Regions:
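Substrate/cofactor-recognition hotspot
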Residues: 122
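Short cysteine clusters
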Residues: 119
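Hydrophobic h-region of N-terminal signal peptides that target proteins for export
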Residues: 10-19
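Cys-dependent protein tyrosine phosphatase-like superfamily
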Residues: 18-115, 128-182
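Positively charged n-region of N-terminal signal peptides that target proteins for export
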Residues: 1-4
Length: 182
């Protein structure tokens, strides 16, 4: 009986860790990671990345770049069967409504399969979107998502203090409201 209780206690204690898996590195040169079975993240892809992407079940690519938005069109064509979506964001102007709109786009396209989200470096705009995705859909705490964005090897640029300031209960509440989750 004591052994069974001990096992239950250990399993209960470890339960939160199972939903907090780290993203899996796919290709370091592209800052390409698998977040979960339906979400990947990267920097702006280059022609050499095409073969790697073709071996992953990605059905849509969401480009968050505001400037120079045509990079994906230079790499992928109609025969690749990958939907290319431009959703430009200015790093210094991201607020809860933009986060919610981006998450809606991701969720909508996940109905067809995995989505890759990227910006120029795959660190800042991509980082805040993946962090909020983790909070909203993986039930991560704000602190866990913030820690992943700031301290993981994605290359977050600390100049973007406005992104760090988005890690609040009020921002998450507003994102949920815009998503129709409250």
């Amino acid at each position: 009986m004591k052994k069974t209780l001990l096992i239950y206690f250990i399993l209960f204690a470890l339960l939160p860790l199972w939903s907090q898996h780290k993203a899996t590195l796919i290709h370091a040169d592209a800052n390409l990671y698998k977040v979960d079975s339906l979400l990947y993240r990267s920097e702006q892809l280059v022609a050499e990345d095409r073969a790697i992407i073709k071996n992953i079940p990605i059905k849509s690519i969401v480009n968050l770049r505001y400037f120079t938005r045509s990079g994906d069109k230079k790499i992928f064509n109609a025969s690749d069967n990958i939907k290319l979506i431009n959703h430009p964001l200015l790093t210094w102007r991201i607020k809860a409504p933009e986060i919610a709109q981006t998450l809606k786009i991701i969720r909508e396209h996940q109905k067809q399969g995995a989505v890759l989200i990227h910006c120029y470096h795959g660190a800042d705009r991509t980082g805040i979107m993946v962090a909020m995705y983790r909070i909203i859909y993986h039930n991560w705490t704000i602190e866990q998502a913030k820690k992943e964005m700031l301290n993981s090897p994605y290359g977050y640029h600390s100049v973007w203090k406005n992104l760090e300031a988005l890690f609040t209960e009020s921002t998450v509440k507003e994102v949920r409201k815009h998503l129709g989750m409250q």
